[in-house]
Amino acid sequence: MESEKILVLCGCFLLWNPLIQSTQLYPGIKVRITQKGLDYGMQAGMEAIELIVKKNGIPDFKGSESLEFLKVDYVDYNFSNIKINTFSFPNISLTPVSGTGVKVLSNHGSTNVSMAWEVTSPLFRDEGGAALFLAEIFFSGLVNLSRSDTGHPTMKLEDCYIRVGHAHISFSGEFSVLYNSFAEPMEKPILKNLNKKLCPIIMDRFEDINANISSLEVVTKFGEDILLDYSLLEPPEITQSSIDLNLKGTFYQVGNLTDPPFQPVPFTLPDRSDSMLYIGISEYFLRSAAFTYFLTGAFNITLTTKELSKHLIQNPQGIGSLFSQVASTDVGLAILGQKLICSLSLNRFRLSGPESNRSSIEVLRFENILSSILHFGVFPLANARLQQGFPLPNPHQISLVKSDIEVHKGFLLVSTDLRYDPLWKKQHFGG
């Protein structure tokens, strides 16, 4: 008698819900940035900002001033090729403002700038190079955090105020000795123009930052046939001590962006501040992964045993009536690199059915067959997939260190510190 081929679809979770369209109201992933994380982020951010401003420099600026001490009615000047050589803001702080954004405050900043200059007046015209030292820089502003239509975080600088208290310029060139003797009176108009132009320049830089953020992928390919959506569901939630990001955290089959047939449920992260970052991974996130693997056929196994076929023929209720509360498993969790690694192990397998049938030789044989299939077929297949890991959400060029995992009701909690690595090339917002 030819064996009958029976396709058994097995996943990490039993998902027998009807397929329906759904709209996600709650996050699959919650990320909390604490004050400790903000403090470190500011330290790392200043390194990044220094690299950016050194690379991009400052836009040219020009103007016209009268030099009464030389009895010159006007001098037109143009400063170009402005490059920042050193950059120091030793006293800078980030403070969350509930429901609004993050307050940035800095004082005692200083910088060394090199530039080319050109001056024109009714009496003379000249050009050369100059070094400009700026000190006693005070800055304050409110960074408003929001969400773009594509689910990216956005930042907008509001209430910008900047004051440069001291400037010293040193000219170079053929007549540098002459110009340097008149440098002090020229520093006042330089300060005046800088204090007028710096806030617009900084605001433009925020536009550049938003453009870079919007280019990062919030839907990333996971394997060959699965997508993972880390987009923001809503603007960041800001309290006096932390910033919460609610991320979608949903898996999809490539080419099919239909939401899973189940909804995430709300969960609350514990009130802690010892770590820089807390990541809550909901049960929905894991169910979404299992469901998507299920749809892609990742856990498909074909059975051809005569004994299995015979048993199903004699029991028209089929496998569905037996396949509930039958397996006892352990789940191992670890964080390697930027990924959550899971592994499954089978402790015990027992068919659930009428107790009078438990002593049946055929039932025991069927139970042993399925136990072997799970132990040697399904679980190794699932673990091979799970060993690829789930990428955890983390900021650009930031690694997770000193990480710990706890199991809570309805979610996993990852507590971690951060380490900035400017050489690490990362292409995704989420992982």
Question: Which residue ranges define each predicted feature?
Answer:
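Extended, low-charge, aliphatic-rich alpha-helical segments
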Residues: E2-N112, G165-G431
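Well-ordered mid-protein domain cores that form the structural environment of catalytic cofactors
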Residues: F87-T95, K103, T111-E118, A130-S170
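Amphipathic hydrophobic-ligand
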Residues: F124-S140, G318-T329
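Hydrophobic alpha-helical segments, principally membrane-spanning helices and signal/leader peptides
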Residues: T120, R125, V143, T150-G151, ...
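Short, solvent-exposed secondary-structure capping/transition elements
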Residues: A116, P122-R125, T150-P153, F206-E207, ...
